[in-house]
């Protein structure tokens, strides 16, 4: 009798086990989403007490300034070289009874998650255009086309290092730019430029994506060039709290001027093209700017004359990556964090190609994405951990070679033709 009872109990437990396994299998994608999210939180939490040189020498001092001068009241006399909207957040932090180091990192990590969500949503939107699937976020969470790019962006080494270790805020402007590009795809041009203005209000590095918007304008002509006026207008709107506290209007302009002239080095801990030439800032700065503009202009001529179809998801994202990467590689005074946007966009491009019917150049995109991550991780290691294991000259040669390889493949035989079957927005 006892044996029968044991067998019945064993059968019942196996049925329960099968139900659990089936449930896990049925919700595998949702569980993957939860695992990615939990891993991202735990990784960031594990390094919460790390203090970077930027935090010790800048962010902590700025926080003390706002704390000493009564929080929001200090907005009339901002400190440092960060944009006014970000300094509003610093003022807000002084009213929260939490360690300031944690507050800076929490703010950046919130935008890590927003950036990852819209990177995944970008890929999911492109895929759903082709397959006719639902585009709701609820459905996206149960779809690998959303979950994989979401998880990869969230766990990218440079994304984790930037916010959780460094305490920097590049995820903020990158999020607004990805959202802006997403809205361009949805033909919501007004809000696209509003969010582009939000990006510009937080970071001057937003200018790296502007050549791409000019390419879109001259090739597709779907929006007015006057939409670019949203960049200064949104900056002014987001600065209203500071202006109300007595901030002089000229300070809004001064912060951009100071940022553009803050570092008198042709290159800064980043394997840019000019590291091969030298570091005579006074002579090479104008040369670097002119050459960058020339390369971008040649790109514009090619795109217009060859009638490159920027409505193609492949072309759209490839040109966006190329324009940002060109700016970072050839402009003066670039350092390791400035390739952040290109690193995010090429991940989006990779996953878009992965779920496309045409996977041409998928391997090339994967290699380029990995090299970009590797280059930046090496330079992050130099700054954050004083790691000098990798020779700077080798990383410089590899970085420049991969850029030239990507450019050659893109402009010689990489663009999708108008008569090919492609994913269009």
Region annotations inferred by a language model:
Residues 1-44, 110, 124-148, 312, ...:
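Start-transfer (signal-anchor) and selected internal transmembrane alpha helices
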Residues 2-10, 47, 252-271, 320, ...:
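Transmembrane helical bundles and short interhelical boundary loops of multi-pass, membrane-embedded
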Residues 24-57, 109-112, 155-157, 161, ...:
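Transmembrane signal-anchor helices characteristic of membrane glycosylation enzymes that use polyprenol
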Residues 28, 40, 116, 125, ...:
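Aromatic/glycine/proline-enriched transmembrane-helix motif characteristic
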Residues 48-64, 77-89, 263-273:
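Extracytoplasmic catalytic/substrate-binding loops of multi-pass membrane glycan-assembly enzymes
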Residues 118, 172-189, 345-349:
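Specific aromatic-rich, kink-prone transmembrane helix
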Residues 161, 177-183, 190-215, 323-330:
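Membrane-interface alpha helices of multi-pass inner-membrane proteins
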Residues 208-233, 341:
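Perimembrane helix-loop-helix junctions
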């Amino acid at each position: 009798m006892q044996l029968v009872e044991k067998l019945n109990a064993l059968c019942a437990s196996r049925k329960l086990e099968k139900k659990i396994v089936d449930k896990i299998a049925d919700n595998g994608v949702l569980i993957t989403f939860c695992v990615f999210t939990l891993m991202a939180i735990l990784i960031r939490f594990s390094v919460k007490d790390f203090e970077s040189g930027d935090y010790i020498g800048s962010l902590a001092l700025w926080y003390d300034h706002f704390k000493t001068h009564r929080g929001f009241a200090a907005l009339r006399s901002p400190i440092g070289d960060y944009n006014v909207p970000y300094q509003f957040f610093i003022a807000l932090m002084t009213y929260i009874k939490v360690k300031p180091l944690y507050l800076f990192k929490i703010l950046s990590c919130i935008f890590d998650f927003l950036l990852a969500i819209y990177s995944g949503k970008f890929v999911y939107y492109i895929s759903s255009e082709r397959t006719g699937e639902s585009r709701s976020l609820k459905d996206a969470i149960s779809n690998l086309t959303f979950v994989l790019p979401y998880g990869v962006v969230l766990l990218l080494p440079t994304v984790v290092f930037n916010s959780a270790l460094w305490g920097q805020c590049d995820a903020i402007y990158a999020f607004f730019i990805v959202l802006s590009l997403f809205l361009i795809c949805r033909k919501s041009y007004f809000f696209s430029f509003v969010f582009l203005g939000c990006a510009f209000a937080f970071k001057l590095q937003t200018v790296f994506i502007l050549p791409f918007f000019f390419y879109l304008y001259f090739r597709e002509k779907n929006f007015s060039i006057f939409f670019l006026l949203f960049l200064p207008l949104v900056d002014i709107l987001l600065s209203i709290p500071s202006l109300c506290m007595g901030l002089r209007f000229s300070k809004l302009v001064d912060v951009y001027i100071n940022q553009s002239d803050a570092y008198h080095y042709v290159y800064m801990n980043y394997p840019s093209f000019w590291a091969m030439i030298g570091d005579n800032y006074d002579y090479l700065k104008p040369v670097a700017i002119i050459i960058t503009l020339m390369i971008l202009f040649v790109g514009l001529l090619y795109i217009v004359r060859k009638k490159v179809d920027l409505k193609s998801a492949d072309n759209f994202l490839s040109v966006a990556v190329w324009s940002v990467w060109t700016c970072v590689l050839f402009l003066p005074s670039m350092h390791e964090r400035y390739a952040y946007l290109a690193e995010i966009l090429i991940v989006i491009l990779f996953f878009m190609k992965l779920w496309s019917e045409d996977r041409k150049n998928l391997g090339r995109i994967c290699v380029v994405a990995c090299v970009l991550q590797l280059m930046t991780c090496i330079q992050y290691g130099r700054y954050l951990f004083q790691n000098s294991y990798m020779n700077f000259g080798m990383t410089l040669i590899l970085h420049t070679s991969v850029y030239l390889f990507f450019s050659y493949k893109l402009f010689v035989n990489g663009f999708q033709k108008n008569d090919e079957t492609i994913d269009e927005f």
